[in-house]
From Swiss-Prot:
Keywords: Cell cycle, Cell division, Cell shape, Cell wall biogenesis/degradation, Cytoplasm, FAD, Flavoprotein, NADP, Oxidoreductase, Peptidoglycan synthesis. Its cofactor is FAD. It is found in: Cytoplasm. InterPro entries: FAD-bd_PCMH, FAD-bd_PCMH-like_sf, FAD-bd_PCMH_sub1, FAD-bd_PCMH_sub2, MurB, MurB_C, MurB_C_sf, Oxid_FAD_bind_N. Belongs to the MurB family. It is an enzyme of class 1 (oxidoreductase). This is UDP-N-acetylenolpyruvoylglucosamine reductase. Its EC number is 1.3.1.98. It holds the Pfam family MurB_C. Residues 34-200 form the FAD-binding PCMH-type domain. Pathway: Cell wall biogenesis; peptidoglycan biosynthesis.
Length: 320
C-alpha cells in the first residue's frame, strides 16, 4: 500500500479537511476479528460537512469503502485500495428523542445506545438493538435484526450523502428493505436516521432487554474475536442447524474456527488471517451445499483484495 503517495497526489484537494487521514492503516486494529490487511488511506471525517467536502474533493475513479465499528466485517489480507471511511462517534454519534415515540440517531451511534435511550424514554420496539454489537449505519445498510425484530420495522427516514457530497433523504419504502438487505445505492453513506417505536412501560422494555442479553450470553461466543452471525438463515431453516448437520461445528482451519458454542459464529482463536477466516467460511458453504443442497449466503461483509496466491473461490469452486 502507498497511502502517503495517494494523499500527496491529491495535495491541495484535501488541504481543508478537518478530519484525520491515516496512510497504510492497520484494519486488524478495528475489526472484531482482529485480522486482515491495510487500508491505503483511512479517513475519519469531523462531521457531515467535512465528509461532504471530502467526497467532492476525491475523484470518482478512486475507490471509497465505508466501514462501521467492524463488528460484521472481514478484511482480506491484501488490504483495501483507495480510501476507507469510518464515521467517528464525535461527529456522527449523537442520539436524541425527537418526539414521544421517535428517536434520531447518527450513523456512528452504537445500536446498544439507541436501545438504552429508548428505555429511558419509555419507547418500545428497540430492545433487539441491545443484542446487536454494531452501529446504526451498519444496521441501516443490512437491515440488522435480532429476536424476531428488524431495523426496517423502526425506520422512518434516512439521511445520507451521495458520491458527490449531496444530501439525500429516503423514506422507509425507498430503502428497499428485505431480510438482511437494503436496496439503497451502494455509494450512499448514511449519516443519520429517524426511528419510531411505541409507548411502552419501562419495566417491560427492561425485561425484554435483559432477555436479549441473557440469550446472547447463554448461546453466543460474545467474548471471542468474532464477527457475529456468519451466514444468513436460509428460508425455512437456521444456518446453524445446516452447519451442524454438515459436521462443521468446531471445524478449524489455521487460526479460524466455527464456534463449538454456536456454529454459525466464526471465531479467531488468536492467529487467524483473513484468508483462514474466508477459507473456513467457504469450506462450510461447500460442505453444507454437498450435504443438503443449500447455498448459504454470507451475512458477514468481506472487503478488500486477496493476498497474491491466496484467493478463495466461492464454495471452494464446488458447483452442484
Amino acid at each position: 500500500m502507498h497511502g502517503q503517495a495517494l494523499i500527496d497526489r491529491l495535495g491541495d484537494r484535501l488541504a481543508g479537511l478537518r478530519g484525520r487521514l491515516t496512510p497504510n492503516a492497520e484494519m486488524d486494529k478495528i475489526t472484531w476479528f482482529r485480522a486482515g490487511g491495510l487500508a491505503e488511506v483511512f479517513f475519519q471525517p469531523a462531521d457531515e460537512e467535512d465528509l461532504a467536502a471530502f467526497l467532492r474533493a476525491v475523484p470518482e475513479e478512486i475507490p471509497l469503502t465505508i466501514v462501521g465499528v467492524g463488528s460484521n466485517l472481514l478484511v482480506r489480507d491484501g488490504g483495501i485500495p483507495g480510501f476507507v471511511i469510518r464515521l467517528s462517534a464525535k461527529g456522527f454519534g449523537e442520539a436524541e428523542i425527537v418526539s414521544p415515540i421517535r428517536i434520531k440517531a447518527g450513523a456512528a451511534t452504537p445500536d446498544k445506545r439507541v436501545a438504552a435511550l429508548a428505555l429511558e424514554a419509555g419507547i418500545g420496539g428497540f430492545h433487539f438493538y441491545h443484542g446487536i454489537p454494531g452501529a446504526i449505519g451498519g444496521a441501516l445498510r443490512m437491515n440488522a435484526g435480532a429476536n424476531g425484530v428488524e431495523t426496517r420495522e423502526r425506520v422512518v427516514e434516512v439521511r445520507a450523502l451521495d458520491r458527490k457530497g449531496n444530501v439525500q433523504t429516503m423514506s422507509n419504502a425507498e430503502m428497499g428493505y428485505a431480510y438482511r438487505h437494503s436496496a439503497a445505492p451502494v455509494g450512499l453513506i448514511f449519516t443519520s436516521a429517524v426511528f419510531e417505536g411505541f409507548a411502552e412501560d419501562k419495566a417491560t422494555i427492561k425485561a425484554a432487554m435483559d432477555a436479549v442479553q441473557n440469550h446472547r450470553e447463554t448461546v453466543q461466543p460474545i467474548r471471542e474475536k468474532t464477527g457475529g452471525s456468519t451466514f444468513k438463515n436460509p428460508e425455512g431453516t437456521s444456518a446453524w442447524k445446516e452447519i451442524d448437520k454438515a459436521g462443521c461445528r468446531g471445524l478449524m482451519i489455521g487460526g479460524a474456527q466455527m464456534s463449538p458454542m454456536h456454529c454459525n459464529f466464526m471465531i479467531n482463536t488468536g492467529t487467524a488471517t483473513g484468508y483462514d477466516l474466508e477459507y473456513l467460511g467457504e469450506t462450510v458453504r461447500a460442505r453444507v451445499l454437498e450435504h443438503s443442497g443449500i447455498r448459504l449466503q454470507w451475512e458477514i461483509k468481506r472487503i478488500g483484495n486477496f493476498r497474491p496466491g491466496h484467493a478463495v473461490q466461492e464454495f471452494l469452486g464446488q458447483l452442484l
